[in-house]
Amino acid sequence: MNPVLLDGKKLSEKIKEEIRSAIEERKTKNFRIPKLATILVGNNPASETYVSMKVKACHSVGMGSEMIRLREQTTTKELLDVIDKLNSDPNVDGILLQHPTPSGIDERAAFDRIALHKDVDGVTTLSFGKLSMGVETYLPCTPYGMVLLLKEYGIDVAGKNAVVVGRSPILGKPMAMLLTEMNATVTLCHSKTQNLPDIVRNADIIIGAVGKPEFIKADWISNGAILLDAGYNPGNIGDIEISKAKDRSSFYTPVPGGVGPMTIAVLLLQTLYSAKEHFTPPVK
């Protein structure tokens, strides 16, 4: 086998360059610069890092960025009031509420308060419902990033057996739906799935989205499989035992440098789409 590395870092830079050019063109036409508002509640160190990365990414493409920092003791009502103000602000195109929020916050209520046309992170129940019905909306960033990687490398998933390991509402479930829209035959697995190794062995495409280091073992994987690892665990380890499995694969994403960079690139891309007043194009 001569496995091909799916270079998310390279593709993300290509996407960001296209965004940068689009913003420059908007400037020449005296159009408003797209703007992303990010809300950080509390002092979670990992969240601080992720938010700073998103702010930096906005600046790198010439996009406006507003970071709203709220105290750990913020109530759900106070957070909803902040989201309402951003919803009504015509200069804000996208709203991102950094997950996780403190335990005292009703996070689902906060996510669902985000206006559909500003839900550039694809986290609202309404966005998820539209995705499930094949209706245009904004998509969860990590799954859509994986779809763009597949398309960039000319991988046609139609008719292939795809196994998604993990069923979170922002990763596993939407990825399964997107692959279904692309005419793959999808099996969605989780902690209660029986005979998981046998199911994975029959897969042409394997998506690691379970959040457990090297949970998907190399000896579960058939020769020529396509491996997309959305996991990122301490020690730069993904959910798939990539180091042992990649030589038998046809395509694979590295960790880091595969799926991760695509997540932020898609966030910026969907913010640009919002500024242009249209949803993300269909994945087919």
From Swiss-Prot:
Q: Function of this protein?
A: Catalyzes the oxidation of 5,10-methylenetetrahydrofolate to 5,10-methenyltetrahydrofolate and then the hydrolysis of 5,10-methenyltetrahydrofolate to 10-formyltetrahydrofolate.
Catalyzed reaction equations: (6R)-5,10-methylene-5,6,7,8-tetrahydrofolate + NADP(+) = (6R)-5,10-methenyltetrahydrofolate + NADPH; (6R)-5,10-methenyltetrahydrofolate + H2O = (6R)-10-formyltetrahydrofolate + H(+)
E.C. designation(s):
1.5.1.5, 3.5.4.9
**Gene Ontology process terms (BP):** L-histidine biosynthetic process; methionine biosynthetic process; purine nucleotide biosynthetic process; tetrahydrofolate interconversion
- Gene Ontology molecular function: any one: methylenetetrahydrofolate dehydrogenase (NADP+) activity
Question: What gene codes for this chain?
Answer: folD
Q: List, alphabetically, the NCBIfam families matched.
A: PRK14177.1
PROSITE patterns given in the database record: THF_DHG_CYH_2 (PS00767)
Q: Which organism is it from?
A: Leptospira interrogans serogroup Icterohaemorrhagiae serovar Lai (strain 56601)
Q: Name one Pfam family in it.
A: THF_DHG_CYH_C
Q: Which residues bind NADP(+)?
A: 166-168, 191
Q: Which family does it belong to?
A: Belongs to the tetrahydrofolate dehydrogenase/cyclohydrolase family.
Q: Name the keywords, alphabetized.
A: Amino-acid biosynthesis, Histidine biosynthesis, Hydrolase, Methionine biosynthesis, Multifunctional enzyme, NADP, One-carbon metabolism, Oxidoreductase, Purine biosynthesis
Pathway(s) it belongs to: One-carbon metabolism; tetrahydrofolate interconversion
A GO CC term attached to the entry: cytosol
**What does the annotation say about its assembly with partners?**
Homodimer.
- Acetylation: present as a keyword of the record? no
The protein's name is: Bifunctional protein FolD
